[in-house]
UniProtKB/Swiss-Prot annotation, chain B:
Coiled coil: none annotated. Disulfide bonds: none annotated. Keywords: Cytoplasm, Fatty acid biosynthesis, Fatty acid metabolism, Lipid biosynthesis, Lipid metabolism, Phosphopantetheine, Phosphoprotein. GO terms for molecular function: acyl binding; acyl carrier activity. The modification O-(pantetheine 4'-phosphoryl)serine is found at S37. Pathway: Lipid metabolism; fatty acid biosynthesis. NCBIfam families: acyl_carrier (TIGR00517), PRK00982.1-2 (NF002148), PRK00982.1-3 (NF002149), PRK00982.1-4 (NF002150), PRK00982.1-5 (NF002151). 4'-phosphopantetheine is transferred from CoA to a specific serine of apo-ACP by AcpS. This modification is essential for activity because fatty acids are bound in thioester linkage to the sulfhydryl of the prosthetic group. This is Acyl carrier protein AcpP. Pfam families: PP-binding (PF00550).
Amino acid sequence: MGMRRVVITGTGMVSPLGCGTEASWSRLIAGGNAARRVTEFEVEDLPAKIACRIPFGDGSDGTYNADDWMEPKEQRKVDPFIVYAMAAADMALADAGWKPESDEDQVATGVLIGSGIGGLEGIVEGGYTLRDKGPRRLSPFFIPGRLINLASGQVSIRHKLRGPNHSVVTACSTGAHAIGDASRLIALGDADVMVAGGTESPICRISLAGFAACKALSTQHNDNPEKASRPYDADRDGFVMGEGAGIVILEELEHAKARGAKIYAEVVGYGLSGDAFHITAPSEDGDGAYRCMQMALKRAGLTAADIDYINAHGTSTMADTIELGAVERLVGDSASKISMSSTKSAIGHLLGAAGAVEAIFSALAIRDNIAPPTLNLDNPSVETKIDLVPHVAREREINVALSNSFGFGGTNASLVLRRYNGD
Amino acid sequence: MSDIAERVKKIVIDHLGVDAEKVSEGASFIDDLGADSLDTVELVMAFEEEFGVEIPDDAADSILTVGDAVKFIEKAQA
C-alpha cells in the first residue's frame, strides 16, 4: 500500500502571544514580544527570573481563561498542560469543522499529543504531600492528572475520538515528532484524521531552577526581559522559557476534499535523527540536524532549492550556530533565496509544545506569504547569506516551509510543509 | 441541619461542582451527583481532613450518599 497524502485542516493554539491561532499569529507578525518578569511565584533566588507566560485574562481579546476550556472542578484534577491541550484541541477541531458523531468517523479519528516534561510541578507537590502528610493524603487524581499521555486521553474522551491514542515525549522535539508520527499513521491508513501536537506548562520554580542548573536559560537579561530571547545575536545567553499548546488537525487528503475542508498546507516531509553525542548539547558538527532535514526533504521529494522559509529551532543558545551551519550545508548555493527565522525570539521556548506551535506558524507563513521576524537580532554573531528576518516580518513568496526541532538527548525532528494547490 | 451535615454538604458542593439544592441527605454521590469512583475516593479524603477522622477502606465503600457520610462522621466523633 502506498503512502496516503496528509493535509492540515485545522489549527488551535494557546501561546504566550495569545489564546487562538489568529491572535497569536497577528501579534507575531506585528513584532509582539511576550517575555516578562515572572510575578506569580518567588523568583528572587532563581538565576532566571523571566518567562513568556500565556496572557491570562477573562478570555476576551486573545486572553486565556482556563474556565472557558474546562470546568473548574475538573481543572483541579489535572496539571495546566492538560487544560492548554484541551483548549487548543477544541479550537483546532472547531476550525477544521470536524465533529465525528458516527461510529465510523469516531474510530477513524485519533489523538497524538505530547509534552516534554508533563506535570512536573504537580509531581513535586505530590512528593511534599507524601512526605508531610503520608500516602493516605495523596489524591486519586495525582497520577492521571500528571501523566503526559493524559492530554491525548482527555481530548479523546471529550470528543469521543476512538482511533489511535498515542503520545510523544522527546523533550523539545516533541511537538514536531507528534505531528510527523501522526501524519504517518494517516499515511499508512491507521486513521483518517489525527488531532496532533504538543503542550507544556513548565513555568514553575523547579523547572526554572532545573533548566538554569543545566545552563540552558538566559540569566543576563532579567531586568530587560524583552531583550532576552535573541537567536543568532552576539549577546544571546540562553533560552527564555515559554508555555502553551499547539494542535493541528491532520487529515487524509481525499477525506478532507470530500467534505470540502479548508486546507492550510500539506505535510509532505518528515525526518528524524539522533545525535548520539551528549545529553544536552547538540553534536558540534551539526550532523544530526543535517541528516534530519535531509531525510525530511527526501521524503517530500524536494530539494534544498525548493525551500522558501525555515522556522529554525533557534533557541537563543550557542546551539544556534550549529543549526545554522547544518542548514548552510543542506542548502548550499540556495542560501540567498531562503528566509529563516526563530519565532522563539517572540514567544520563548515552549519545550514540548514548540515544534507544534512552530509548525502552525510555518503553515501560516505559507498561507499568508510572510516570514515572521527574528526579534533582537541587533548584532549577528554569524555571517550568512540566509535572510534571518531581523526585527520585522518579511512579505515574500513562500510555498515550501521547513520547521526544525531539536531536543535534549540528541533527538531531532524536521517537518516539511507545502502549499496545497488543489492537485 | 447539623453542623456536620452543613460541612459535609459544602465539601460535596466544592468537589463535585454541583448545585446546593441537589445535595440532599439521600443523594448518591455516583448516581445523583455525577461522581466517578475516583471522585468518591477524593471525597472520603476530604472528609477525613475536614473532620480529623480516619475512614478505613471497607467503611469508605459503604459511604454512598451524603447521609451515609454524615452518619459515619457523627458516630466517629461521638
